[in-house]
């Protein structure tokens, strides 16, 4: 009887989710209640985790808790440490949940709410969550090896070396971009800097408490950490109000860049239980807490989505970013649905912490479900704003101008009527001097969150506090991806160096670890620092590559798992990774090609293509006599040239992995030839 009731409940959830999604898709009014989205997502994510992740875990991957994980076999107290699955979940979620799920969906909102909702919900359940889960599985069956090293083992030395170089390049770009977002959020913000700084001693206290004083007492240390975190947040507010204290905790962007480099270096070489894992777990409290409160607040307030279902900008003519809905919406949403960066964490720090194989389901699939929820909440924060206000915040200065009246006039001409007074009122309510062209997604999320709180409390004076709290939240949200990313990149560099000089590949060696970490931090730190002193240089040169390279990385990771499953003889099961791989690689190859096509009569394609931009800039250089303008054009030409070259390189790497994957899978299926042989570590039974 009880089993039948449970089955009926799941059937009801499926029907309810389908109805809510149908309402979102077919609604024709000017606005729609966000509750439809909340209910639809709750049903779809619950069904996906309960049934699809279970099917993958026990029918395809066949997880075995009697098989010892790398953390148990190689327990060294530093990198390989068996860790409670709640802590591991906290670490993994904190590490993967960077800027992407907050920024991508907000930018994609320029095309309307429906395309992003469908891609986030369906794409994450069938693609992104699967991607994180299966890569984590592959790594724990290969002694916690990195993605590049696994490609080398399963596809051959040459392919592995080329792929590792490409993956490392993508990784350094991603870390530098994430670090720059943190720098921009904390620059000249004593409240934000103080709170972020305090999470370090709090995390160390938690690590020592669990390691030496009260091992396995997760609830105790959770309560202690949460209370101290709340105290730090409130103390940060008073620090910012005291002129003397505020001056101590106020830093410019360049100083913060050096500090983040130092923090990334130290966090990467210290034992994982001492700082990285407890700090990520602590950050997860705030991340999940804020998102959870935001979901409850949305249910309570039930604000309408004011952004249209589909806007005229699906053709690629929008001011926020260039490119049509296919393929550039998928590239822009990025981490909210699927992210190659996650594959690096799933084959970096996390597989070295899992205490048993079944934990991979919650940690891999479950963490990505949570990140996808974050992406939807970010989309809601953008969608509940007046469309005119959304475009005022996210459109570049070159499109709307510097003056509020001019901006209001331009945006109204796009069909989203807004007055200068409405823009000024919002600017005043959040305590900023201007909200025009505050691109990047973070201010939009912060304003949306502040508006939801305002609707609950009914007092516009609270908006300034919650706006700045949200900016702080985003900085904490992203910094955890920087430290975990640096540690993961250190593993990748050691894998590469080990091919040249074997002792450098020894993960247990402190000297080798310090050397590899130094190379890693110098790699991403250079681009970060240059970006703080040159608004068109450093990481800003490589920023346009983030979306394409990140998704290309996800495609390569899915190909690896497909090869592994084919070698294991699980041909039908391999479709869980093969089908998403085909879709993601189709999207990324198409978008990559569009980024390097020559100049044409299509203005949208010209805005997207680096090669077309080089041709346009070259024509301008020939007509320019002003020395300052000439230097600016030459710098822009150089940036586009670098982006075009790297885009082609990343596509060639992905194409090489694709060709070899098809060959290996074909031989396994049609000829029963397994070469290179399956590289699983020998079975060791848990003692």
Predicted regions: what they are:
Residues 31-50, 108-138, 148, 193-203, ...:
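Extracellular loop-to-transmembrane helix junctions
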Residues 18-31, 102, 114, 172-188, ...:
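Transmembrane helix-loop junctions in multi-pass membrane proteins
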Residues 154-172, 366-373, 439-441, 460-470, ...:
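Loop-to-transmembrane helix boundary motifs in multi-pass membrane proteins
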Residues 1-14, 47-102, 284, 324, ...:
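Membrane-interface "cap" regions at the ends of multi-pass membrane proteins
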Residues 22-28, 32-33, 80-142, 153-157, ...:
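Membrane-interface helix-loop-helix modules in multi-pass membrane proteins
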Residues 35-43, 47-60, 166, 190-233, ...:
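Membrane-interface loop-to-helix entry segments
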Residues 53-81, 107, 121, 130-159, ...:
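Flexible loop linkers connecting adjacent transmembrane helices
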Residues 298-314, 369-447, 484, 529-537:
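Extracellular/periplasmic helix-exit of transmembrane alpha-helices
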């Amino acid at each position: 009887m009880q089993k039948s009731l449970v089955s009926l409940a799941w059937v009801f959830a499926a029907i309810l989710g389908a109805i809510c999604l149908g309402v979102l898709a077919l609604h024709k009014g000017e606005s729609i209640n966000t509750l439809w989205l909340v209910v639809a997502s709750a049903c779809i994510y619950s069904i996906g985790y309960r049934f699809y992740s279970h099917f993958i875990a026990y029918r395809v991957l066949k997880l075995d808790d009697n098989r010892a994980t790398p953390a148990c076999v190689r327990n060294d107290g530093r990198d390989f440490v068996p860790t409670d699955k709640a802590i591991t979940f906290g670490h993994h979620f904190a590490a993967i949940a960077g800027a992407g799920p907050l920024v991508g969906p907000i930018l994609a909102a320029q095309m309307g709410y429906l395309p992003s909702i469908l891609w986030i919900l369906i794409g994450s359940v069938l693609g992104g969550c699967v991607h994180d889960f299966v890569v984590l599985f592959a790594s724990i069956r290969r002694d916690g090896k990195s993605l590049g090293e696994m490609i080398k083992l399963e596809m051959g030395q040459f392919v592995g070396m080329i792929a590792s170089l490409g993956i490392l390049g993508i990784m350094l770009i991603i870390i530098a971009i994430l670090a720059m977002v943190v720098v921009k959020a904390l620059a000249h913000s004593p409240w934000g800097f103080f709170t972020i700084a305090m999470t370090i001693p709090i995390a160390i206290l938690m690590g020592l408490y669990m390691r030496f004083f009260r091992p396995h007492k997760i609830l105790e240390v959770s309560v202690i950490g949460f209370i101290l975190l709340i105290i730090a947040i409130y103390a940060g507010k008073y620090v910012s109000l005291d002129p003397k204290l505020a001056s101590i905790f106020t830093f410019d962007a360049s100083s913060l860049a050096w500090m983040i480099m130092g923090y990334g270096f130290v966090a990467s070489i210290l034992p994982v239980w001492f700082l990285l894992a407890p700090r990520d777990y602590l950050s997860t409290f705030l991340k999940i807490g804020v998102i959870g409160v935001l979901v409850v607040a949305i249910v309570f307030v039930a604000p309408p989505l004011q952004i249209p279902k589909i806007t005229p900008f699906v053709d690629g003519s929008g001011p926020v970013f260039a490119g049509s809905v296919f393929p550039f919406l998928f590239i822009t949403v990025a981490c909210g649905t699927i992210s190659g960066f996650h594959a690096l964490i799933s084959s970096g720090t996390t597989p070295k912490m899992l205490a048993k194989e079944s934990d991979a389901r919650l940690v891999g699939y479950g963490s990505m479900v949570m990140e996808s929820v974050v992406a939807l909440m970010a989309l809601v924060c953008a969608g509940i704003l007046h469309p005119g206000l959304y475009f005022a915040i996210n459109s570049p200065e070159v499109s709307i101008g510097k003056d509020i009246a001019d901006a209001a006039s331009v945006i109204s001409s796009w069909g989203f009527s807004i007055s200068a007074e409405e823009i000024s009122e919002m600017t005043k309510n959040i305590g900023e001097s201007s909200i025009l062209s505050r691109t990047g997604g973070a201010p939009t999320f912060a304003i949306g969150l502040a508006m939801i709180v305002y609707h609950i409390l009914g007092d516009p004076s609270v908006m300034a506090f919650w706006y700045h709290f949200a900016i702080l939240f985003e900085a904490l949200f992203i910094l955890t991806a920087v430290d975990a990313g640096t540690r993961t990149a250190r593993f990748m560099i050691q894998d590469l160096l080990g091919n040249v000089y074997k002792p450098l590949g020894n993960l247990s060696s402190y000297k080798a670890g310090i050397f590899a970490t130094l190379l890693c931090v110098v790699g991403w730190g250079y681009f970060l620092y240059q970006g703080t002193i040159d608004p068109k240089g450093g990481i800003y040169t490589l920023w346009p590559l983030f979306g394409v390279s990140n998704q290309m990385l996800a495609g390569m990771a899915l190909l690896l798992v497909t090869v592994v499953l084919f070698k294991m003889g699980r041909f039908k099961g391999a479709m869980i990774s093969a089908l998403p791989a085909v879709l993601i690689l189709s999207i990324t190859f198409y978008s990559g090609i569009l980024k390097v096509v020559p100049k044409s009569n299509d203005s949208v394609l010209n805005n997207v293509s680096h090669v077309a931009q080089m041709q346009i800039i070259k024509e301008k250089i020939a007509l320019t006599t002003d020395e300052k303008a000439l230097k600016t054009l030459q710098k822009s030409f150089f940036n586009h040239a670098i982006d075009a070259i790297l885009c082609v390189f990343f596509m060639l790497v992905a194409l090489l992995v694709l060709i070899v994957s098809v060959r290996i899978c074909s031989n396994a299926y049609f000829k029963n030839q397994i070469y290179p042989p399956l590289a699983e570590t020998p079975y060791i039974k848990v003692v």
